[in-house]
């Protein structure tokens, strides 16, 4: 805990509000709310916590807070701040799950489409459907019944669907707008569950066609009626009232929360949404935050009813749902409370305070929270069922949340057990104590340019990225893998001895006998007795065998074993890490080398160009004016363009290596 945090902890008020934790870069990494700011914020820095909270606290370098008038106001403000800053430790809903909807467009002659995103475009949406197949099945059925427009608005002749009676082509053929409007209304009624009227009409048409001996047409009507019946049976009816509702259940265990949402449409359970995430506050409060974010997403359409468990505060749910749906999470009442009570210490600067206050002023112009809340709740009811089928639905959602969370833990425990067992078995196979900490090294260079090395660390079979290290080769000229490895290992373990930091239980070299022998020589010179193994690759650049012992021998390992899989992961990871570092360094060197010597272009201006254009090719394609706009004088921009357009001695070498030649052996090793 630094001095800034210590000073601010003494100034915390006893009021409700929101707090923002920041890292060393001033980035907001967590937003929380509290009924009592003093008690909540201080609790982070006192007492014991679980691993996740300890990790969060270890990154906190500064904090801020905003005082509000009530706990509900802090809840709504918290959601607003999370959406604004997107802190890495907060609950953030996944944005990659877009369920399909049927959309009736807001056009003169509407179309029926299957879409994945709900937009505020005046169209009417129905769904969500379990998958695209289900949505397309309903659309195909409706296409057979209603000849909705499928062609564009600028067609000059009828489309293909016109000839098979699935499009009226209203742009080419005159269609009475009222007729089209009535048809659109029938489609909407069908999609809201009122299909009895349509079935009755189809039955009448089928009988009429049969009486007129139009047997093919009668068969078509029969098939459509049958398809409607099949569609009904595919959807499980949960309630006879045919209302749209979302059913929420949640479960918490071991610092994790799982929220399960059932989508019930026209009384049928059609889909569910599952989210699991670590939580740091009170479980009920984090669940409320989840609901607030859930309904901010346009793809989560507001149903007629929302079912929630009995242990959740109903008033809070009503507040966050209302605010989320309006797209404006700070109400007028909140704005006044925040504006009047924002804490600003004279001796401490809050970098985001001005931004927060400006947002509040802007939002203060909106409608009052009371009016917005009553308007929303006139359409949507928040219900806490206490018995019957509705209570069973909430219980089912809660039970499913528990099952999903337990499944996550079971899978994780099996993976941990499997990985730990592989580490233990590897030690037995090599005849050494269990290698809890394994370190691996690899070099990377092209023709001796930008030579680098990298070290990765695996602890209990899992990568420990905080212990990874990158090395620029300092004493070796040209492409000498052995000399580079000697330098890097000497630097690594000399420093470890000097600083008395952790040493590995096993060193796994990316390479064969040559790399292993270099490692052994370095360790011998430093007086270290650490086992060294070599991970040798075949001609396809894949892990093929493990070398160990004195003299080195191939260790018999099944390619299907967990031990072999662990070694492959280590070798792939150290190679990836080294290659990535080398490419980053090579790109910077290439960029600088071509711009070196240009009068008026120093390091700062080079950095401006790199930030704006990312690479040399982008600068070459830019105009002189665009280069100047990146932050360099016009005459310097001209010199840059002239230099890049002239032949450069290293161009052929660099570009042929970078773009036209596959990875060379020295980069693969």
UniProtKB/Swiss-Prot annotation:
It is found in: Cytoplasm. Residues 648-658 have a biased composition (Basic and acidic residues). This is UvrABC system protein C. It comes from Lactococcus lactis subsp. cremoris (strain MG1363). NCBIfam families: uvrC. It comes from the Bacteria. One of its GO terms (cellular component) is excinuclease repair complex. Residues 196-231 form the UVR domain. Interacts with UvrB in an incision complex. Residues 14-91 form the GIY-YIG domain. Residues 647-669 are annotated as: Disordered. Belongs to the UvrC family. The lineage of its organism: Bacteria, Bacillati, Bacillota, Bacilli, Lactobacillales. The UvrABC repair system catalyzes the recognition and processing of DNA lesions. UvrC both incises the 5' and 3' sides of the lesion. The N-terminal half is responsible for the 3' incision and the C-terminal half is responsible for the 5' incision. The keyword Iron-sulfur does not apply. InterPro entries: GIY-YIG_endonuc (IPR000305), GIY-YIG_endonuc_sf (IPR035901), GIY-YIG_UvrC_Cho (IPR047296), RuvA_2-like (IPR010994), UVR_dom (IPR001943), UVR_dom_sf (IPR036876), UvrABC_protein_C (IPR050066), UvrC (IPR004791). PROSITE patterns: GIY_YIG, UVR, UVRC. GO terms for molecular function: DNA binding; excinuclease ABC activity. One of its GO terms (biological process) is nucleotide-excision repair. SUPFAM superfamilies: C-terminal UvrC-binding domain of UvrB, GIY-YIG endonuclease, RuvA domain 2-like. Keywords: Cytoplasm, DNA damage, DNA excision, DNA repair, Excision nuclease, SOS response. PANTHER family: UVRABC SYSTEM PROTEIN C (PTHR30562:SF1), UVRC/OXIDOREDUCTASE (PTHR30562).
